[in-house]
Every structure is written in structure tokens, then in C-alpha cells.
Amino acid sequence: MLFGFFRTLFRILFRIRLTGDTQSLQGERVLITPNHVSFIDGILLALFLPGRPVFAVYSSISQKWFMRWLAPLVDLVPLDPTKPMMIKHLVRLIEQGRPVVIFPEGRISVTGSLMKIYDGAGFVAAKSKATVVPLRIEGAELTYFSRLKGLVKQRLFPQITLHILPPTTLPMPDAPRARDRRKIAGEMLHQIMMEARMAVRPRETLYEALLSAQDRYGARKNCVEDINFTPDTYRKLLTKTLFVGRILEKYSQKGEKIGLMLPNAGISAAVIFGAVSRGRIPAMMNYTAGVKGLTSAITAAEIKTVFTSRQFLDKGKLWHLPEQLKQVRWVFLEDLKAEVTTADKLWIFAHLLVPHLAQVKQQPEDAAMILFTSGSEGHPKGVVHSHKSILANVEQIKTIADFTAKDRFMSALPLFHSFGLTVGLFTPLFTGAEVFLYPSPLHYRVVPELVYDRNCTVLFGTSTFLGHYARFANPYDFFRVRYVVAGAEKLQDSTREIWQDKFGLRILEGYGVTECAPVVSINVPMAARPGTVGRILPGMDARLLAVPGIEEGGRLQLKGPNVMNGYLRVENPGVLEAPTAENAAGEVETGWYDTGDIVRFDEHGFVQIQGRAKRFAKIAGEMVSLEMVEQLANALSPEKMHATAIKSDASKGEALVLFTTDSELKREQLLHYAREHGVPELAVPRDIRYLKQLPVLGSGKPDFVALKSMVEEEEHHDA
């Protein structure tokens, strides 16, 4: 009677929805593992789950006054991680056929993300051989019963959904010690919980995700700031988005690919969202690629119109680009204000009231954006990402990291770089954090000063950029920073050490590829291991293909919701080439992406990058990683830049060429260091060439195509 009353009351107030297969909750041995976001989670499950499950509640919670009130109505078992007998009691209950509910986090989330997962819950699942049913509670975190005050826009009665996910099992880990089995079981359950979050992510477009963020965090919440030092709220960003979207229609057609050549600025975010809301596909133009690289991009994506800014071209000294690239129409943002009519203003005002109507009909799987590869190994390729793939990568990042609305991101990597776009713009916007967009990562003195001045808590960049920031920064500049993330190139030991010694900060290294939107794996405070790039993100499948000559590891292939729709190539303009990869049996499979990177997984699933398959030399029958050669040079000369190329060799097949900006670096030094540290002598180049400055790409990485050309030109000349 009382249960029926409260069930009806909650259903009316919170519009409770129960999704999934409830039959999976009624098996012989069932362990239900929900996330924990509010004080009413237990009440919700007691009222709406079928049957009468036993609730395992941590002792610190079970002794509260409201739990005493619930005790006569539901079956409670106090859980104390320090008392093994309680774990055994839960195992017996499951073996007797009672469904048991355990909140594996053991406490209510204070970040909105998953908290630490206690090993005990995983051990119970493995020991009892239970069917594990993950359950996601969505919406309760927005109530006043959550602990997210100040992080989300709380409300009295938000809609709450209980998602029952497909059941799974958790086998007892094969480890010699009970402590290890318990720990591994906890990690396995953590993975199940993360996969559950990914499984219930909303089906949205980028524009809809912006509206959802405004609704979740509040229209008046600051979200974007640039060097004008006037932050935009979600409401103001939406207004600019509607304005730009309306005007872009006059210069393009629905479904057309339009070039964007813009700096890191608030208006750039508005142009991106404005374009996608009206069904245009922004192609992010890499202005550092030069006329040749941009010509390839324009051809591959069949771009007819490029939107840019006069002020940007002035400050960047880039006027030679529109002067030489006459095959496209150039439209300047400064001219758009003059295009606004009274009808446009009325349209914008009306759609501020009903912003969902501003989006033209489209699906999350439709093409949303085009990014271009760096061209480090040939012509730049257009990488077509859908709304789904970009938002999946953002959700993967949110699942493993605890970014909140109190964070402030410093984003200096350009938006044409996939790392800068996803991690530097979309991730903060969709987590309620504020982002400061700065137009250049090369201002090594300015960036640390802005991190200090704007109270930034999250900084990311390449190893090269982070190393320069550390050298020029005051030891107090990063006093508020809690996340420093390195990607796009291998993190150098010298960079890691200076950040630890000077600032007391641990750099978290990650790995990504443009084709995966881009983050594939990343170390986070909850799961970090030096010398690795973290674990593969939840929601992704990974496999290794054996490579002749490589004893440990193999070529990494990936499949998941964040993988691109396909390539656009210069050789076949405008035609989408879906991702495919050849499996171990030699069969071509669609949906898989071959990274071309040689990696290995350690015993805990952390990824170690060995190098690119194309960046190995075969010397006297042995495979030598070019990255190993560069690491050798970096160890002796960390202040300089080094890059390795390959030349043909009559006696050994191939030989190494080391390009360096250190005029004092000699083979004898490299050989001595290699012998001391167990590096094979084959990895020590005989041909060392000094360059005052290495050719580099816009991302800061060496231009290996240019270096290869230099080697080939010399070989041709010698011939």
C-alpha cells in the first residue's frame, strides 16, 4: 500500500522511465550494479525494480537516520570493506537466489562522472558467479538530492530514467594471490560501469548537444572566452550561432562542404555550430599547410567557399593564401554584419525562444565536420566525422575523466587540429567547463601567464609545447592546474621531469589519431602508468596484427563509435572511402581502422607505443624504430629537436639518417649512451646531419615528408 503510493507519487513528480529488459533482473544469481548520483537512488530502485532485491549499503550510509526509516520497508545489508565476512554473506545471498543491489562507487558522485569503484563489488560478482546487470540512473543528479550543487543547474523535478543494460558475467580472475584477484575483479567491474555509461549516451547532433549543455548547466553560465577577455555565456554563444547559421545560408547549400580558416576565438565556435545547425559541413583548413597542402584539401573535399577573417589574415600574415588560392570564393566574417536584414533579426529572435527549430533535419550519423591529416606521410586526407563520432569521443573522455563546470581549459592548439577541436573546444563546452581560446601555442611566455591569470585548471599540448611552457613559466603559474595532458607526439622524459620538479605536476600522456576524433587512450588520475598512453577508451574494440620482425606487440586496429565515416582523397575528390582493415586471416572488414602504429599492451591493459609501422627501418634484417633513435638523441640533447629518416644502403638494405638542430651531437656520444642503456648499436645512426631548423608541421611535429625528400634528393644527386 505504502509502496504503491510512493511509486505513483515518484512517477508523477519525476516522470520515471524504466528502459531495458526487466527479465534479466529475475534470474537465479543476479547482481545489480547501478551508478550513484543522488540520495534518492536507493528509493528509486526499491520502488521501480521488479521483485524485492537486497540492498548492500556501505556502513557509513546505512547508519544514517533516513536509512533506519527505510529498514522496515526494504532488505538492507550493511557493507564494510574492512570486514570480509560481510562479503561472504552477500555471496551466499546471491547463491541462494536473492537479487542483490550494490552501488560499486560506495558514495554519491561529486563530479557527475564515475567515482572510484570498490574492489569488493567486483569480487562478489566473480565469487558468486552472478549475472551482472549494469544499471544507469540518469536525471537524479539534477535534483536537489544530488551533490552537484554549483556544477549543474539543479531543479525540483527533472525527468529520471532507469536504464537496465544487457547482462554480463565477471569471471574470477586468474591470479595467484587473493588480493590480486580482488583488484582485477574491481577493474573489470569498473570497465563494465564505463561501458554502461557509453551505452546510454543520447543520440544527438553537435547543435543539439550545445542546447543540452545550455539546459544542463544554465544559459547564463560562462562557456567561452578569447583574447578579447569578454566571456560568452551559453546564451550568447547560441545567439551568435543562430546569427552565423542564418547568414551562411546565403553563401552555401545544405550538405555543402565549406572551408573554415579561423583562429582560436569565440566567433570560431559560433561559426562551427552555426554551420552544422543549418546542415553545412565545416572543413577545418590548416593554414600552416601552405598553398600546396591547402590545394590538396580543397580538391579532396570539393570546397567552393572558404570563410575567414580579415583581422586574422592581417595578424597571421596570411594574405598570400587567398591571393594564390583563387579556385575558391573567400568570404570574410567582418562583412557578414552588413548582410543582416530585419527578417534575419526576427528569425534569430524567434529561434532564441525555440532554438531546436533552428536545426535543419539531420541524423547523428550524418557527416558533421571534416578534418585533415597533417600530411606527414603524403598528401593531406580529408577525415569525415559524423556528429555521432565526435560526441562519442567527448563522452568517452567524460566517462574516464572528472572534468566539471568548475574547470577552466586553456586551449592553444589550433581548432584545425583534431586534438584542439575535440579536447580544446567540444569537451569543455559539453561538460559545462569554461574554455579560454588562444590563437597560438607558440607563444611560450604568454600561454603560462594566461593560465595563471585566467585560473585555468586544465592544460594540454604536445610534448614540445609543454616543454617550452615549463622553461618560460614561473613556478607559481600553474598553481591551479590539476590536469596536464600531452598528446600528438611522444612525451619526452625531460619534459615529464621538469613539470614534476618545477611545478609538482604529473603530465598525463594520451594517444590519438585524427580518424578516431581523436582520443584513443589516455592516462587519468584514476588509472595512470608512466611510459604508457593509458588504456583504450570505453566503447572501443582493439586488436593487434602481427608484424614480421616485431617480437612484442603488433599493428593496432580499432573499431568503435568514434571512428570516422571515411576519407576524402585528392585522387578521388568528393568520394567517401569508408574505413576498412585487413584482419589476421587476410579478410577486409568494414568499420575497422588500421592506425599503422605498432603497440603492445601490458598485463593491465595499458598501451605502449612502439612506433609507426612506416617509421621502422629494416637494417641487416632487424627492425629498428626511428622513434627509438630520436629518443636516444633527446636523452643526450633534450633542448634541441631531432628527427630520423631512412636511406637505402647497399650492404644492409637500409640505413638511418639523423637530422638534428644540435651541431655538437656526435655518433660517439650516442654510441656510448646506447651501450650504457642497453640500446642496440643498430639504432645508432652513422649519418648525422645538422640543420639550423627542422621543417615542422602546424602541430609542431617534424615534417617527415620534407626530410625524406631531402634524403632522396641527395641520393639522386649522388647517383
Swiss-Prot record:
It comes from the Bacteria. It is found in: Cell inner membrane. InterPro entries: Aas (IPR023775), AMP-bd_C_sf (IPR045851), AMP-binding_CS (IPR020845), AMP-dep_synth/lig_dom (IPR000873), ANL_N_sf (IPR042099), Plipid/glycerol_acylTrfase (IPR002123). Its EC number is 2.3.1.40, 6.2.1.20. GO terms for molecular function: acyl-[acyl-carrier-protein]-phospholipid O-acyltransferase activity; ATP binding; long-chain fatty acid [acyl-carrier-protein] ligase activity; medium-chain fatty acid-CoA ligase activity. The active site is at H36. Its main location: membrane. Residues 15-138 are annotated as: Acyltransferase. GO terms for biological process: fatty acid metabolic process; phospholipid biosynthetic process. Disulfide bonds: none annotated. SUPFAM superfamilies: Acetyl-CoA synthetase-like, Glycerol-3-phosphate (1)-acyltransferase. Residues 233-646 are annotated as: AMP-binding. The chain crosses the membrane at residues 258-277, 409-433. It is a multi-pass membrane protein. Pfam families: Acyltransferase (PF01553), AMP-binding (PF00501). SMART domains: PlsC. One of its GO terms (cellular component) is plasma membrane. It catalyses: a 2-acyl-sn-glycero-3-phosphoethanolamine + a fatty acyl-[ACP] = a 1,2-diacyl-sn-glycero-3-phosphoethanolamine + holo-[ACP]; a long-chain fatty acid + holo-[ACP] + ATP = a long-chain fatty acyl-[ACP] + AMP + diphosphate. NCBIfam families: PRK08043.1. In the N-terminal section; belongs to the 2-acyl-GPE acetyltransferase family. PANTHER family: ACYL-COA SYNTHETASE, ACYL-COA SYNTHETASE FAMILY MEMBER 3. This is Bifunctional protein Aas. The gene is aas.
